[in-house]
Structures are given as structure tokens and as C-alpha cells.
């Protein structure tokens, strides 16, 4: 593709030159000239008043959208264990499938993973597309994307959902490019438009300060990655059965360009905040980064982990992996302690579905108390030691 200027139409108005974000356009002898810095962004095409600029080599792909049916969930597994986010996607996928009157399917890749299909059926899948091959034992972008791309081309799903995990965030954009469709990343809400039956994908934007709803009107499949912990887990029914469709998982030399030499698991003793049943979270009300040591004492007593707010991450007090909120991780622990956290809407969105929320704050008017099940107005440096003392008394 290249940007071309039709000299006979160009009037040398310089609007394209002023609009170019890469300074790639000059005006020579009253004619626009496109330089090597051009990235084909197309901004100049939109502003040209005489339609003297066009993009060569582009053909609009017109798809028969009626050919695409079914909601697919990428059934991510690691070492023979299905990731928890898959069950959340099956729950949400079933709702979407019911609204548009189609079936819910899972696509499973791996080596010797056929026995996992029963678990996918139990969580609501009507069909499972299975690719089982030694080359798929460990995740590679080339291997997984080849198989799923071929399956999408053959079976034409209407919607494909992925967990916003490390693997999902790598695989989904690769497939979106391969099948020439759009992708909405890190969605926190999915719904079907009642009028046109397209999926409305909502995700945080501009640092979580607003929520953007995105649609994919002309391309299929519609693709989304969804954050773990956002959607409700599907109901489990072991009596549910379905159809297994085996995919061709044949690879030629050179299809997979990378080789996994070793998987080094984290050596940290901390529990992931997305998996923890008990979370003790601290905000700027701690007053100092050393305050997290006190929170860790309480978390250790409960067998939980420490989390934080975005403000503490921005201040360099804590790591982003510990951040709860729209721009961090969404969590659903049994108990969530909010210590010195004021309760910004972005943070609340990431923890409001916790079973029990306990807020500790000096400011009795802090917004966090509006969502808390129990609120303690006081100095956290006095309250938390008192809680630890009581836990010691009961043998915790």
C-alpha cells in the first residue's frame, strides 16, 4: 500500500501537510509530495478538499456476515489444566449465544488434552473443537494461531472470546490480523445490541477515566479479550454432554519458528491477587511505602496477599501486579480489606464484587464506605494491629 497524490487534482492548499502527524508531506511547485516518513495512516486523505490523495493497493473486503454463526471461547489450558477465566468466558458466552440464538463452542489446543472436553461440556459448551498434537504441548504463537486461524476460516464463528491472560493477549491480536478483523482488548462488559445483534464491547480507556463501548460492524468474527475475574463463572453440570470436532493439527517444517526450551515458574511466595481468597489492600492513606509491611502481616495471618491502588503504583510504592482496579486487576476474594483507600470509582470497579468488603479509613466521608459491608473509621496503624491481636487469640 502507498499514498499517492493525483497531481491534476492537487491545488497546493497545504491542508494535508499541516495535518500529517509525521511531517511526511512537503509542498513543491504547489503540489503535495509524500516523503519516506509516510506511515500510510490516511490522515491526509480525510482532509484533502479535492480528493487528490488516495491509498493505492487497498480493496475493501466485503463479507457475507450471515455466514458466521456461533460463539467461540478459547479454552486456554496450561499443563493439562484449564484456566479459571475459561469458565467465566463460557458463562458469559452462553448468555451471548442465547441472545442471538446460536451455539456456544470452545476451541481447545494441546497435547493429550482430549479428557478436558468433558469439563468444558460441564461448564456449558455445546461443541468443542479439539486440536491435539505433540507440537501443541507448549504454547507458541505460530502453532496455536495456525490451528485456530484455519478453524475460523473453516467454521466461521460469529464471536470469539479470549481471556486477557499473557497467552490470550499474545494470541488474540495475532489472530485478528490473520483473519483481518477487529479486536477489543481487556473488556469488562459484553452485551448484544437488541437492534442489530452485534456485540457491544466495553473497556476502560484513558487510564480508566471513562468507559468506551466498541462495535465491529463490518468484519467477522467479532473478537474480545476479557479480564479474569470480571464475569461470573458458568454453572457446573457434569451431566451435560456435547459434540467433539477434531481439527487437523498437521504441521510442516517451518510452521513453528520458535521452540520452548524451558518454563521457569515464579519463585515468589505471594499469592496472585486474582486467585487470593483474602486480600489486604492499601492506598495512599498508608502515608508511606513501609506501611505495606503491616498489611503483609495481616495478609499472612489470613493466608492471603497484599494489593494496592493505582495511586500507590504511580508513586512507586508497589508493583503494578498488585494493582486492583480498571487499569489493574479485577478481583473477587472472600474478604477484601481496603486500608487507607479513598474509593476512586476506578478502584471500586475492580473489587466491588468481593464477598465481603471491610474498609478502614480516617475519613468517615470516604467513598469507599459506600460499597463496604463493614466500615471502621480510625487510624489503620492502630486498627490493623488490633485485628492481628484478635486473630492471634483465636489461633489464626
From Swiss-Prot:
GO BP term, example: fatty acid beta-oxidation using acyl-CoA dehydrogenase
The EC number(s) this enzyme carries: 1.3.1.108
Record's keyword terms, sorted: 4Fe-4S, Cytoplasm, FAD, Flavoprotein, Iron, Iron-sulfur, Metal-binding, NAD, Oxidoreductase
Coiled coil: none
Top-level taxonomic group: Bacteria
Gene3D superfamilies in the record: 3.30.70.20, HUPs, TPP-binding domain
MF GO annotations: 4 iron, 4 sulfur cluster binding; electron transfer activity; FAD binding; metal ion binding; oxidoreductase activity, acting on the CH-CH group of donors, NAD or NADP as acceptor
UniProt key word Hydrolase: no
GO cellular component: cytoplasm
Location in or out of the cell: Cytoplasm
Record-linked InterPro entries: 4Fe4S_Fe-S-bd, 4Fe4S_Fe_S_CS, DHS-like_NAD/FAD-binding_dom, ETF_a/b_N, ETF_a/FixB, ETF_alpha_N, ETF_asu_C, Rossmann-like_a/b/a_fold
PANTHER family, alphabetized: ELECTRON TRANSFER FLAVOPROTEIN ALPHA, ELECTRON TRANSFER FLAVOPROTEIN SUBUNIT ALPHA, MITOCHONDRIAL
Self-association state and partner proteins as the record states: Part of the homotrimeric caffeyl-CoA reductase-Etf complex composed of (R)-2-hydroxyisocaproyl-CoA dehydratase CarC, and the electron transfer flavoprotein (ETF) alpha (CarE) and beta (CarD) subunits.
Known function: Caffeyl-CoA reductase-Etf complex catalyzes the reduction of caffeyl-CoA to yield hydrocaffeyl-CoA. It couples the endergonic ferredoxin reduction with NADH as reductant to the exergonic reduction of caffeoyl-CoA with the same reductant. It uses the mechanism of electron bifurcation to overcome the steep energy barrier in ferredoxin reduction. The electron transfer flavoprotein (Etf) mediates the electron transfer between the different donors and acceptors.
Family the entry assigns: Belongs to the ETF alpha-subunit/FixB family.
Protein name (record): Caffeyl-CoA reductase-Etf complex subunit CarE
Gene: carE
Amino acid at each position: 500500500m502507498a499514498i499517492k497524490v493525483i497531481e491534476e487534482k492537487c491545488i497546493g492548499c497545504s491542508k494535508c501537510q499541516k495535518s500529517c502527524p509525521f511531517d511526511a508531506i512537503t509542498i513543491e511547485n504547489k503540489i503535495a509530495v509524500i516523503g519516506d516518513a509516510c506511515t500510510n495512516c490516511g490522515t491526509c486523505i480525510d482532509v484533502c478538499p479535492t480528493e487528490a490523495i488516495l491509498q493505492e493497493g487497498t480493496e475493501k473486503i466485503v463479507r457475507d456476515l450471515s455466514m458466521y454463526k456461533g460463539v467461540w471461547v478459547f479454552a486456554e489450558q496450561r499443563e493439562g489444566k484449564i484456566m479459571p477465566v475459561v469458565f467465566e468466558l463460557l458463562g458469559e458466552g452462553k448468555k451471548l449465544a442465547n441472545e442471538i440464538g446460536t451455539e456456544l463452542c470452545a476451541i481447545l489446543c494441546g497435547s493429550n488434552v482430549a479428557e478436558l472436553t468433558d469439563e468444558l461440556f460441564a461448564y456449558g459448551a455445546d461443541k468443542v473443537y479439539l486440536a491435539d498434537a505433540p507440537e501443541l504441548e507448549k504454547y507458541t504463537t505460530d502453532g496455536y494461531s495456525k490451528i485456530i486461524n484455519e478453524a475460523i476460516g473453516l467454521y466461521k464463528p460469529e464471536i470469539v472470546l479470549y481471556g486477557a491472560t499473557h497467552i490470550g493477549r499474545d494470541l488474540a491480536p495475532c489472530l485478528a490480523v490473520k483473519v483481518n478483523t477487529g479486536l477489543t482488548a481487556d473488556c469488562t462488559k459484553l452485551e448484544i445490541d437488541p437492534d442489530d445483534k452485534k456485540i457491544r464491547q466495553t473497556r476502560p480507556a484513558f487510564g480508566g477515566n471513562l468507559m468506551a463501548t466498541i462495535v465491529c460492524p463490518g468484519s467477522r468474527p467479532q473478537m474480545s479479550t476479557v479480564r479474569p475475574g470480571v464475569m461470573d463463572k458458568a454453572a457446573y453440570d457434569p451431566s451435560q454432554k456435547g459434540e467433539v470436532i477434531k481439527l487437523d493439527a498437521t504441521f510442516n517444517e517451518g510452521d513453528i519458528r520458535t521452540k520452548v526450551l524451558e518454563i521457569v515458574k515464579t519463585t515468589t511466595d505471594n499469592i496472585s491477587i486474582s486467585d487470593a481468597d483474602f486480600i489486604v489492600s492499601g492506598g495512599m492513606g498508608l502515608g508511606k511505602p513501609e506501611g505495606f509491611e503491616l498489611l503483609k502481616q495481616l495478609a499472612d495471618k489470613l493466608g492471603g496477599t497484599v494489593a494496592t491502588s493505582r495511586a500507590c503504583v504511580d508513586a512507586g510504592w508497589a508493583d503494578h501486579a498488585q494493582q486492583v482496579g480498571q487499569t489493574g486487576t479485577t478481583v473477587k476474594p472472600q474478604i477484601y480489606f481496603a486500608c487507607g483507600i479513598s474509593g476512586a470509582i476506578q478502584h471500586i470497579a475492580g473489587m466491588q464484587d468481593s464477598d465481603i468488603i471491610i474498609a478502614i479509613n480516617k475519613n468517615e466521608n470516604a467513598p469507599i464506605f459506600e460499597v463496604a459491608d463493614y466500615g471502621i473509621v480510625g487510624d489503620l496503624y492502630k486498627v490493623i494491629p488490633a485485628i492481628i491481636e484478635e486473630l492471634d487469640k483465636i489461633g489464626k
